[in-house]
Amino acid sequence: MVVVAVSGQPGSGKTTIAREVARVLKVPLVSSGTIFRELAAKMGMDLVEFHRYAETNPEIDKMIDALTAEKAKAGDVVVEGHLAAWVARPYADVCIYLKASSEVRAKRVSIRDKKSFEEALREVREREELNRKRYLSLYGIDIHNLTIFDLVLDTSYLSINDAVRISLDYICTTLEIKYSKKIC
């Protein structure tokens, strides 16, 4: 019943790394970020607009987080999202936090979302602040307190392959020790 939670800053590589970890572990990926983006698109909003909307509509976060917790409790899953580790911690074997400098994250987001660096930088910073305020207000969670994480990884100067390798080395070693057998 392997459960890995990947959280982190916007643009830090959460989804990319979580997807690869899930592939290697041969378990499904539940991405709260993907669910959030799909809901934003359905409502015709960009991410920042939808984050603002979610501030006054807490049922959105609660629904996504309840789904994440349910999947983590069932086991054999990688959950990914800003709050994934806090939501999945009671069930998670490993919780990973990914971070990177604002500039690096903005560059990644500008490429991914095909927008200017300046717009991406503003969006990354605003999304992070909106998340911080919303999660503190909604759940009393300070997303800057990283004490619940088993591994905190700065991806600023790592390739995707290096970040995945470091994450998997840690996960596989932890799971092997915890379950006294080779998992990956």
UniProtKB/Swiss-Prot annotation:
Subcellular location per the Swiss-Prot or TrEMBL entry: Cytoplasm
GO cellular component term of the entry, any: cytoplasm
Xref: InterPro entries: Cyt_kin_arch (IPR011892), Cytidylate_kinase_dom (IPR011994), P-loop_NTPase (IPR027417)
Reactions catalysed, as given in the entry: CMP + ATP = CDP + ADP; dCMP + ATP = dCDP + ADP
Broad EC category: transferase
Residues reported in the UniProt entry to bind ATP: 8-16
Chief localisation class: cytoplasm
The enzyme's E.C. designation: 2.7.4.25
Top-level lineage group: Archaea
Any one Gene Ontology BP term: pyrimidine nucleotide metabolic process
UniProt keyword terms in alphabetical order: ATP-binding, Cytoplasm, Kinase, Nucleotide-binding, Transferase
Record carries keyword Kinase: yes
NCBIfam families on file: cyt_kin_arch
HAMAP family with a match to the protein in the record: Cytidyl_kinase_type2
Entry protein name: Cytidylate kinase
Gene: cmk
